[in-house]
Structures are given as structure tokens and as C-alpha cells.
């Protein structure tokens, strides 16, 4: 799948070097299929790296995707130059009248704070509420998933005994769900978090299904039955080196982190980590784009605002595109 982004985005060169199809404006104008319009709320501190990770996963199907990035104006980002945000990101006030086929809300390293203590919490609440009427399918990652569950259903989060960090084998609980078409019974899934959404409170939300779980991680992927809301408690988007970087960062900050589980060969952090989840990540995001987004939205983009009220789309009946 080609992704179309603003020309000059630093991630473009890295993506092309990795054989990822990135499309410029001129070529995009000659496409005959309707592109999907996706919004990425990037809450991660290393924004350029997260951009590349997300775009890589969006690029692997035959569809064209127009990707826009959103940042929180109520937060001072120390690791990203304002010029980069001005050039390649939009604020909520700039996009709130628009409609999107899909939304991705990333994680953020703020999970040890209460939700209301996060300085951009009010702004994020507005975006989550806005998405109900302006986005067809929303995918939330790690803290972004915990935040959305709290905002929408009042599901609180709780501290884990220690940081859950490493690569864990997760079981596919709903193999017939479209998001898991083509999956094996288990897949490797990066985790990096101190908290979890309260499992007993999740069970009380009748519209949510547990799609994946493991003994070590608990619930790992949830979704509404109509796939309009999807919650990933781990980081399928992570690169091979991301957990290693976080481990070194935590050591430098004096946090005395445990070694990420099932990650470094022979449990030696001097060894290069093995990538064991990339194919599952690519397949999951492709399934999301195809079955939850593309198959559910109308061919004519201007009809999306009317279509958003349809809550019971049958994924066995494809719309004509």
C-alpha cells in the first residue's frame, strides 16, 4: 500500500531505503481508487521514529492512504523541534471539521500519572469525543488504549507489580475475527508498560471483545464487535531496537530496569535483539485497514459523515468500492 505524506517529511528517505512505497502528490492524483484518510495522534516523545514505524505498517496493502499527523498544542514537546511540528503536523482546531476513515492514537510515557494529571488530557478528551462522529475506525495503542477506555467507559488503570517489558507470546482468542485473518494461533507481541486497564471493569463493557491475551500480559487486544474501536495494550509498531533503547534510557535515569523478557539472545543485552513480531504487526495493520476501515467506509468520501452512524456493519458483506 502506498502512503502519501507531505513531501520533505524526514521519515520518507528511511522508508524508501526500507523498500516502502511512499507516494508523492503528482502520482497520487492519478490513482483511480478512493484513498483512505487517516489521522495519527502522535503522543510519543521520539516523534520521527514513531512516524516511520507507523507509516511502515500502513504501507503494505494495495490501497492508497493519505496520512496526517496531529500533535497536542497543550504540551511542550522537548524532543521534537517546533519547526517539524509546524511543517508536518496539524492541530486539532485545524482538522476538527474534517472526517477520517481511520484514527491511530499512539502510546505515551505518562502512564504512571493519573489521567487527569497529564497536561494535555483535556485536549485528548476532546479528540476522543470528536472521533465518535468524525472517524470510522479508531485504533489505540498502549497508554492511548488505556486513556480511551477510561474516557469512553470509565475503565480505570492499575499499577502492575513491575514494568511489563519484553516480547510475549499472545494467544488469538477470536480466530474468526477479521483482524486475525491469516494469523497463527499465537504471535509475538512487544510490551512496555507499568499499568494495565482493570480487567474486571473491561468485562463489564458488553460491547467489547477480548481478541488476544496471555498469562503474562493479561488482555492484550480488545475491540468493539463492529471494529469501530480497537485497543492494543502492546506495541506491534516497535522496531527491533526500540525496547533496547528504552532499556538503556531507563538505566541512565537510574530506574534499575529488569532485562526485557524474551528479547536479547541468551538474555545478554550485548547481543543484537531478534525481530520476531514484524510479520504479525504487518498483517494486523493490513487487516485493520482492509476489514475494519476500507470495507466499512463508503466509496464516496463525502458520504462518510452519514455513514458514521451505521453501527452494525456486516463484515461478510463487502460494499462495492
Swiss-Prot record:
Kindly list the positions annotated as binding substrate: 163, 192, 249
Which is a GO BP term held by this UniProt record? L-methionine biosynthetic process from homoserine via O-succinyl-L-homoserine and cystathionine
Catalyzed reaction equations:
L-homoserine + acetyl-CoA = O-acetyl-L-homoserine + CoA
Q: Which pathway does the record list? A: Amino-acid biosynthesis; L-methionine biosynthesis via de novo pathway; O-acetyl-L-homoserine from L-homoserine: step 1/1
Q: What class of enzyme is it?
A: transferase
* Function field: Transfers an acetyl group from acetyl-CoA to L-homoserine, forming acetyl-L-homoserine.
Question: Entry's PANTHER family?
Answer: HOMOSERINE O-SUCCINYLTRANSFERASE
What is the official name of this protein in its record?
Answer: Homoserine O-acetyltransferase
Q: Which organism is it from?
A: Lactococcus lactis subsp. lactis (strain IL1403) (Streptococcus lactis)
Q: What is the lineage of its organism?
A: Bacteria, Bacillati, Bacillota, Bacilli, Lactobacillales
Q: Gene behind this chain?
A: metAA
